[in-house]
Amino acid sequence: MFGRLYFMLLLSVGLVDCLSVVKDCITNNGEDYRGTQQKTSSGSTCLSWRSLNLKFKDSQTGVGDHNFCRNPDGSNKPWCYVSGSSGETKKEACDIRICQDQNATEAPAPEESVPTQGLTQRMVETFEPANSFPSQVEGAAVQPVKGVRQQVRSGPKKKKDLGTLGYVLAVFMMAIIILLGGGITMGYFYKRGRDLKKQHEQRVYEREMHRITLPLSAFANPTCELVDENTIVITAEPNNQTPTQEPVEGADPLMGSAGTPGA
């Protein structure tokens, strides 16, 4: 029973492989195409890849000892080398249909489609004749032709994102710069105000010391002395009467006109 199951499993795997080989259509630009198409769009028969002394990795590009159309360099469609009218070797694109089960959103752009009757400059490239390659460099690798994908990769590189840590460090540095600037400004104004206060206190102290150290003559006022002498004379004048003087009648406020005391 297990032998029958194993045989059925092998048979199903073989059928799947056969169907994948028979499937002669491409998806996208046909880099994974492994069909048996041997003619180009112009009807020319492809040359064998080994006869051109080209070295490609068969496991990745599908190039080997055959003349089937392949796309080892990422071109728009599968292609192969053919012999020109003058004996030169040139590259031509193959006319292979697109798989019908492909999603419409993944269909190639219109500018990438290749007409079946004409050949553009990108599809046809002239190379040296195959017999011009020296036999001693049979295994030498030839640089593949750059396609659309290689041209896109050579564009400007995207700037590296600093990330959250980079932005945090930038904000931290800006805050430090702002704090330093504010501290320097406040320190300048504080020192300036303290110097002005010291100058004012010094002026007040100098004026006070100058007033204290003045001589006594600076406080002498002749007018003030004259007034003081007059006052002293007036208050110090004796009120003595001579024996010849008699009090005037009625001059004493305690005496009445009749001479009666208390009147």
Curated annotation (Swiss-Prot):
Residues 185-263 are cytoplasmic. One of its GO terms (biological process) is negative regulation of phosphatidylinositol 3-kinase/protein kinase B signal transduction. Residues 19-163 are extracellular. GO terms for cellular component: extracellular space; plasma membrane. It comes from the Eukaryota. SMART domains: KR (SM00130). It comes from Danio rerio (Zebrafish). The keyword Glycoprotein applies. It is a single-pass type I membrane protein. InterPro entries: Kringle, Kringle-like, Kringle_CS, Kringle_sf, Serine_protease_kringle. Pfam families: Kringle. The lineage of its organism: Eukaryota, Metazoa, Chordata, Craniata, Vertebrata. Residues 239-263 are annotated as: Disordered. The chain crosses the membrane at residues 164-184. Disulfide bonds join C25-C99, C46-C80, C69-C94. This is Phosphoinositide-3-kinase-interacting protein 1. Keywords: Cell membrane, Disulfide bond, Glycoprotein, Kringle, Membrane, Signal, Transmembrane, Transmembrane helix.
